[in-house]
């Protein structure tokens, strides 16, 4: 597959090499140009003028909402080596750094949620989005029913890139969102605490500490790692794949979206093409 490179300056990302466990899908909340996204990260500074170290390893271009230009549609640009890292999640939790270190981020150029005014659709900067680039979810997701559509070329490029990264970094693509979308393996009935711990470990569930469960037969209190994993399993049964997820927040392996760790984000939105792409990973 064709992956272009437009590397950020050295100080814009961390050069520490970290084993990868997860892949996170984002959208940029911006225009179709991936090179412009990367250039904006170069300019992005703290209030005191320091480097922010905010980026994803990859950005995938889209289709212009102004003139329909497709020169960048599905174009993948790598802006730092995927084995290295930068901040892209922004979680207000003690494990934020670890989750960023252990993940590979992919941004898709897309404006995100849209507002309908009459028969027209507008993004958050009041730019008009053509009707043929709009998805009507049929229900509100995070307060919005209409979203800028991810293009077919973006979906294909995202899938190909995720599959490649899964192979390169031994990330199980059947974990994470695919488990939620396809439905989890059901826990056998009648298991005691030790049996539940063994089963949860076999299925890849982890405790709130980000580790496999200790198989000691002790349930512990309501905030124990065993109960954290059991509640994660119950959460998976509800099938809310694009909502906050306990396993994602703990650092469980697999493919996730930004919405799985941030309640204030809309990336990715649950568009049918995205759902089918994630469900098909590994096929």
Range-by-range predicted roles:
Residues 2-173:
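Active-site-adjacent loop/helix surface patches within enzyme catalytic domains
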Residues 16-17, 101, 109-283:
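Basic/polar, cationic surfaces and motifs that engage anionic cell-wall
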């Amino acid at each position: 597959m064709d992956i272009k490179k437009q590397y950020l300056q050295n100080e814009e990302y961390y050069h520490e090499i970290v084993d990868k466990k997860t892949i996170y899908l984002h959208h940029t909340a911006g225009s179709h140009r991936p090179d412009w996204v990367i250039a904006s990260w170069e300019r992005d500074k703290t209030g005191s003028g320091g480097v922010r170290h905010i980026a994803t390893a990859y950005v995938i271009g889209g289709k212009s909402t102004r003139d329909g230009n497709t020169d960048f549609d599905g174009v993948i640009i790598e802006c730092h080596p995927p084995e290295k890292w930068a901040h892209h999640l922004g979680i207000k939790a003690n494990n934020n750094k670890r989750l960023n270190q252990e993940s590979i981020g992919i941004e898709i150029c897309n404006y995100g949620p849209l507002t309908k005014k009459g028969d027209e659709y507008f993004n958050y900067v009041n730019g008009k989005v053509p009707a043929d680039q709009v998805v009507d979810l049929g229900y509100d997701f995070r307060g919005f029913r209409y979203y800028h559509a991810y293009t077919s070329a973006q979906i294909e490029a995202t899938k190909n890139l995720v599959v490649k990264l899964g192979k390169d970094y031994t990330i199980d693509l059947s974990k994470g969102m695919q488990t939620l979308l396809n439905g989890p393996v059901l826990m056998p009935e009648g298991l005691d605490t030790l049996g539940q711990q063994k089963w949860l470990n076999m299925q890849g569930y982890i405790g709130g500490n980000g580790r496999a469960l200790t198989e000691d037969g002790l349930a512990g209190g309501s905030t124990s790692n065993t109960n954290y994993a059991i509640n994660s399993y119950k959460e998976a049964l509800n099938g809310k794949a694009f909502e906050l997820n306990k396993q994602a927040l703990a650092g469980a392996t697999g493919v996730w979206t930004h919405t799985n760790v941030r309640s204030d984000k809309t990336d990715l939105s649950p568009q049918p093409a995205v759902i089918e792409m994630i469900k098909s990973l590994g096929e």
